[in-house]
Amino acid sequence: MTEEFEIAGISTGAWWSSPTNTAAVFSGYSLPCSTEISPDVTNFGWQNFDNKINDHNDGCMNMHNSFFEGLLIDPNDQLLPDPWSKSTIPNAKSELLENFPFLDNMFLVDSEAESLLDHEIRNHKSSKEQITQDYKNLTSKRSEELEENSDEYSPRLLKRPRLETLSPLPSFKVRKEKLGDRITALQQLVSPFGKTDTASVLNEAVEYIKFLQEQVTVLSNPEQNTIGSVQQQQCSNKKSINTQGEVEEDECSPRRYVDLSSRGLCLMPISASYPVAAAAASAAEMNVHLVSGIFHSL
C-alpha cells in the first residue's frame, strides 16, 4: 500500500505520518481540519503526541493557503487554455461563417442598418440645424420690422393735431385770365356796331355800365320825377365825350328815353309796388261804386 502512495507522488512513509504530503495532494481543496483526530493517534502509541498535533495544524494552514492562492488569479494571465490561443480565433470565425452563410448575411444587414441609422442621424441633425437657423432668421426679421414700425409710428403719436382756424368767409378762387381774353370777352358783350379796337370796346363798356347805373337809380325812385334831369345829364355826358353833334342830338332826344325797357333791364323794388297796388285797388273800388250807382239809378 505504501508503494501505491509512492507512485501517486506522495513521499515514502506512512500516509498518516506526513501531513505536509497530504496537504500537497489536496492542494486547492477545502478539507476539514480539526484536532479531534488526537484520540485516534494516541492508539498507535506515539511518544511525541504534542509535536504531531502541531504538525497537523501546520498542514491544515498550508492547505488553506494553497486553496486561497488558487482563487487569486493574476489578471495578466491568459484565461484561455493553450489550445485556444488568440491566434486561432480569426480562423474559427472564418470557419464558422463558411459553415453558416446566413451569419454573414446577418452581419451585412447589421452593417447596412448601422450605416442607414448613421445617415438618418446626420439628416436629423442637419434638418434640426436648418430649422433653428430659419427660426433665428425669422425672429431677427420680425424684430427688425417691429423696430421699423415703432420708429415710423412713434412720431405720429407724439405730434399734436394742428387746429386750423376756419375763416368765416368762404374762400373764393380767383380765376387767372389774360388781358387779351378779357378784351375779347368785352368785345363779344358790347360790340353791336362791329367795333374791334380796344379803345372803342372799353368806351362802349363804360357807357353801358353808366347807363345801367342811371336806370337803376330812376327805377328805384319812381315817385320822383327825375327822368328829365337824368336824360339831360346823360346827354351832356355823351356830348362831352363824342364829337358828332347831330347823331348825339338824335340819340339824346327825349323821345328815345321815354321807354326805358327798350334800353336794358327795368328794375323795380318791392317797396315801390305797394302804393301802385293800393292805387289800383282804390281805382277798382271806385269803378265798382260807379257801376252800382248807375244800376240803382236805372
Swiss-Prot record:
Q: Where are the transmembrane segments?
A: none
Please tell me whether the keyword Transcription regulation is annotated for this protein.
Answer: yes
Q: Provide one Gene Ontology cellular component.
A: nucleus
Provide the free-text tissue specificity comment from this protein's UniProt record.
Answer: Differentiating root endodermis.
Protein origin, superkingdom? Eukaryota
Polar residues bias spans: 129-140
For the region Disordered, give the residue spans: 126-154
Subcellular location(s) of the protein: Nucleus
Keywords (alphabetical) are: Coiled coil, DNA-binding, Nucleus, Transcription, Transcription regulation
Entry annotated with the keyword Electron transport:
no
SUPFAM superfamilies on file: HLH, helix-loop-helix DNA-binding domain
MF terms (GO), sorted A to Z: DNA binding; DNA-binding transcription factor activity; protein dimerization activity
Please state every residue range assigned to the domain named bHLH. Answer: 163-212
Coiled-coil region: 117-149
InterPro entries according to UniProt: bHLH95_bHLH (IPR045239), bHLH_dom (IPR011598), HLH_DNA-bd_sf (IPR036638), IND-like (IPR045843)
Quaternary structure, per UniProt, is:
Homodimer.
Q: What is this protein called?
A: Transcription factor bHLH114
Q: Which gene encodes it?
A: BHLH114
